[in-house]
Amino acid sequence: MRSDMIKKGDHQAPARSLLHATGALKSPTDMNKPFVAICNSYIDIVPGHVHLRELADIAKEAIREAGAIPFEFNTIGVDDGIAMGHIGMRYSLPSREIIADAAETVINAHWFDGVFYIPNCDKITPGMILAAMRTNVPAIFCSGGPMKAGLSAHGKALTLSSMFEAVGAFKEGSISKEEFLDMEQNACPTCGSCAGMFTANSMNCLMEVLGLALPYNGTALAVSDQRREMIRQAAFKLVENIKNDLKPRDIVTREAIDDAFALDMAMGGSTNTVLHTLAIANEAGIDYDLERINAIAKRTPYLSKIAPSSSYSMHDVHEAGGVPAIINELMKKDGTLHPDRITVTGKTLRENNEGKEIKNFDVIHPLDAPYDAQGGLSILFGNIAPKGAVIKVGGVDPSIKTFTGKAICFNSHDEAVEAIDNRTVRAGHVVVIRYEGPKGGPGMPEMLAPTSSIVGRGLGKDVALITDGRFSGATRGIAVGHISPEAASGGPIALIEDGDEITIDLTNRTLNVNQPEDVLARRRESLTPFKAKVKTGYLARYTALVTSANTGGVMQVPENLI
């Protein structure tokens, strides 16, 4: 066993003495059993994580029943909804790297035989997956689960995106103070990840198709008995996989990454999944070309439109058959998925999901009646984004295939929000928000406030927004993010000026500023070099090492320093 490194031999008597002091070893034979880490992310200020202490206790009990010894440790977590709209958002994406580094440190320092990961919200899930790829120790994931959807006094279904859009609607005067307060009190009624197809739930669903989690991981409610039983079953399966030496890199292959993007397309997932899945591929040693994503989009139908793109919540999807029903439907179209690859269950993706039929065709559409013949995400290329940009086409009004407008440029999120709120931004504008990428932000902050304000003011079909920052999974409208290279790295988005005509072509997947190359070249000559906004602490180190979004926004040590 891997853990023999810390518990076998006379020279490890001091280590064994310390292990006895933990109280985790209940009998003389326990030292001969596998040591299993429980990588938890319990934290009081994140509603998606307040219940994870209870889930970890269930996992510990089940791991002991299965014949192994559990040891729990915790990682940090950032709630994107609470960190939104201020400098706290600078820490959200960078927290992913801290989580990965922290888990790697504990797992490798103590030579665990396996790891039970309990994530739930936005950056915690991908951070833990990065750690699993990096350490490549037998592992299983079981998330905390989504919260129930809220319900307003008027019987309207609510999610967190409803609340962000309500801010713009209230400022516009289209809802009353009483309606506003009612929504605030009822949008998030239970613990769990936010109820729509936002980043947290997108990633938790993707773990099913990647093969790292059990079926229904992405949709079973946080407060359900099914979630607690899933924790138990995952614990038993992990101990079995330790014995069989089934490792994360055996499961997460190039084909698994393809299938993750296919599910994302079918469910209209968050644009952040592109960023995180590219980072996962990088950590797994898989060279993954962005162009593959468009090829996957072309062959994958859009089957389930979930909040913020509709009123359906994750619970509605669960009741309609969950991710297994969507996977089963996609498997009926040859060439869409790679169903014969191994998963954490020890069975193939096909064996896990075959025969799981759709129970509600309003929530999950069949292959012969999709929302769209092509997937809900697109990668755009052009002279603004030579290395790519991302748009959630599933969140754009279906009548819009191209949008051309006049640029109105801002060098920060806050400047843009102020201009939208004071009505400087008008119909026909393309809002350009730059110097908000991984280096520029720093931390690639989410642009939910400006996009929600645009939609809340009734301009969702008349104003576009492009940025080298990113979006919340709750974002909808004509919103293009992850523009690469970012402005802070000298990307062409830095060259756009007010009044430039910009065309977003969803059909041809292009993003261009309609200016001659010689004009852009002259502008580049006078471009002021970017200076880091943060000079000390973690964000200063992050700024120095982080890459643009097209490579997943990962931290890389320059080759000349290795």
From Swiss-Prot:
Mg(2+) binds at D80, D122, K123, E446. Keywords: 2Fe-2S, Amino-acid biosynthesis, Branched-chain amino acid biosynthesis, Iron, Iron-sulfur, Lyase, Magnesium, Metal-binding. The active site is at S472. One of its GO terms (biological process) is L-valine biosynthetic process. Pathway: Amino-acid biosynthesis; L-isoleucine biosynthesis; L-isoleucine from 2-oxobutanoate: step 3/4; Amino-acid biosynthesis; L-valine biosynthesis; L-valine from pyruvate: step 3/4. The keyword Magnesium applies. Disulfide bonds: none annotated. PROSITE patterns: ILVD_EDD_1 (PS00886), ILVD_EDD_2 (PS00887). InterPro entries: Dihydro-acid_dehy_C, DihydroxyA_deHydtase, DiOHA_6PGluconate_deHydtase_CS, ILV_EDD_C, ILV_EDD_N, IlvD/EDD_N. Pfam families: ILV_EDD_C, ILVD_EDD_N. It catalyses: (2R)-2,3-dihydroxy-3-methylbutanoate = 3-methyl-2-oxobutanoate + H2O; (2R,3R)-2,3-dihydroxy-3-methylpentanoate = (S)-3-methyl-2-oxopentanoate + H2O. [2Fe-2S] cluster binds at C121, C194. Its EC number is 4.2.1.9. The modification N6-carboxylysine is found at K123. It comes from the Bacteria. Its cofactor is [2Fe-2S] cluster; Mg(2+). Homodimer. Functions in the biosynthesis of branched-chain amino acids. Catalyzes the dehydration of (2R,3R)-2,3-dihydroxy-3-methylpentanoate (2,3-dihydroxy-3-methylvalerate) into 2-oxo-3-methylpentanoate (2-oxo-3-methylvalerate) and of (2R)-2,3-dihydroxy-3-methylbutanoate (2,3-dihydroxyisovalerate) into 2-oxo-3-methylbutanoate (2-oxoisovalerate), the penultimate precursor to L-isoleucine and L-valine, respectively. Belongs to the IlvD/Edd family. This is Dihydroxy-acid dehydratase. The lineage of its organism: Bacteria, Bacillati, Bacillota, Bacilli, Bacillales. The gene is ilvD.
